[in-house]
C-alpha cells in the first residue's frame, strides 16, 4: 500500500514545469541520469543557476553535451530534477514517520524537515543564496508553485496538525501550516557561523530538536 507522503511526492514530481524524476532503476537511462543529477547538483551548488555550464556538467558526467538533452529538456528542467532527487532522499524517513503514533508524528516531521533545510546542499544553496538562482525563480510559473504549496499544506494539516489539535478551525490550521513552512525556509537561510557565535554555540542537531519540540508543544497547547 502506497503511503500518503509517497502519493504526495508523486503528485508534486509529476507536475508539469517542476522537473522530472529519474527513469526506473532497471531502465537503460537510469545510470546516465543518476550521474548527471549528481554532477549537476554539485555544479549548481558551486556556481548557482546562471553560471552553471551545461557543457561542463556533461564533461563531468563523461558524456557529450547533446546527450543531456536526450534526458532533460533544458537547464531549468535539469536543475529542478536535481531538487526532486534531493527531496526524494527524505521520503524513506517521512514514510517511517507516518507509522508513528499520531502524537509523535508532528515533532518527528519537524525534526526531519528542519534538518533537511540545514544539510541538503542544493536546497540550502537555493534558500541562502537566492541571488544566484534569481533567473531560475523568475522562469517558474507562480501558479505551479502555488499548487505545490497547497498540496504540502493539505498534507501537513490532515496528517500532522489535525490529529493533535481539537480547538482550531480550518483557517487556524492553515495558518499554523504556513508558519511551519516559513520556519523551514528561514532555517535554510541560517549561515553555518550562526551556530558558532561566541556565547551561544549550539550543535545543529540540538538546535533542530529543541526548535521542533517548542513548535510541537506550542501547536498541541493551542
Spans of model-derived segments:
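Alpha-helical structural segments
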Residues: 30-42, 46, 60, 77-100, ...
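Basic, helix-initiating cap at the start of DNA-binding domains
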Residues: 1-47, 51-63, 77-80
Amino acid at each position: 500500500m502506497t503511503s500518503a507522503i509517497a502519493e504526495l511526492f508523486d503528485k508534486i514530481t509529476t507536475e508539469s514545469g517542476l522537473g522530472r524524476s529519474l527513469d526506473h532503476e532497471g531502465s537503460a537511462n537510469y545510470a546516465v541520469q543518476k550521474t548527471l543529477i549528481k554532477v549537476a547538483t554539485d555544479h549548481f551548488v558551486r556556481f548557482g543557476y546562471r553560471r552553471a555550464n551545461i557543457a561542463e556538467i556533461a564533461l563531468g558526467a563523461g558524456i557529450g553535451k547533446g546527450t543531456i538533452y536526450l534526458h532533460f529538456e533544458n537547464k531549468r528542467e535539469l536543475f529542478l530534477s536535481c531538487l526532486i532527487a534531493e527531496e526524494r532522499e527524505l521520503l524513506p524517513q517521512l514514510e517511517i514517520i507516518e507509522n508513528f503514533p499520531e502524537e509523535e508524528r508532528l515533532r518527528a516531521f519537524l525534526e526531519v524537515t528542519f534538518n533537511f533545510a540545514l544539510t541538503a546542499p542544493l536546497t540550502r544553496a537555493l534558500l541562502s543564496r537566492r541571488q544566484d538562482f534569481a533567473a531560475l525563480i523568475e522562469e517558474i510559473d507562480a501558479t505551479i508553485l502555488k499548487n505545490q504549496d497547497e498540496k504540502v499544506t493539505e498534507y501537513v494539516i490532515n496528517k500532522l496538525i489535525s490529529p493533535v489539535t481539537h480547538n482550531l478551525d480550518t483557517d487556524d490550521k492553515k495558518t499554523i501550516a504556513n508558519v511551519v513552512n516559513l520556519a523551514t525556509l528561514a532555517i535554510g537561510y541560517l549561515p553555518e557561523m550562526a551556530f558558532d557565535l561566541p556565547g551561544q554555540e549550539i550543535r545543529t542537531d540540538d538546535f533542530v530538536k529543541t526548535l521542533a519540540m517548542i513548535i510541537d508543544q506550542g501547536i498541541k497547547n493551542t
